[in-house]
């Protein structure tokens, strides 16, 4: 989505293995999500696999919640930029606990 928003149109992007299956891949032609995102998103924060894994482990250890990779992306983005949110109220939408045992093994190994 990030690359499509930069291009202001749907483009093909490379797809790589990730802990965040729900955010993998590109945007389908004709999808309404690009226009919605362009209307409502001011900024995006990119995170890598190590940051997603760290966020998932943080959530397991600190909050005793098992989350999937897509929720880990949101938490990783916050952790990456947390200094800029000091003194502010922040809400992070954590949706999804749909993680298979193999992905969980990758996270905790």
At which residue positions do the language-model features occur?
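Glycine-rich phosphate/pyrophosphate-binding loop at beta-loop-alpha junctions
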Residues: 1-39, 85-109
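Active-site-adjacent helical/loop segments in soluble small-molecule enzymes
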Residues: 30-87
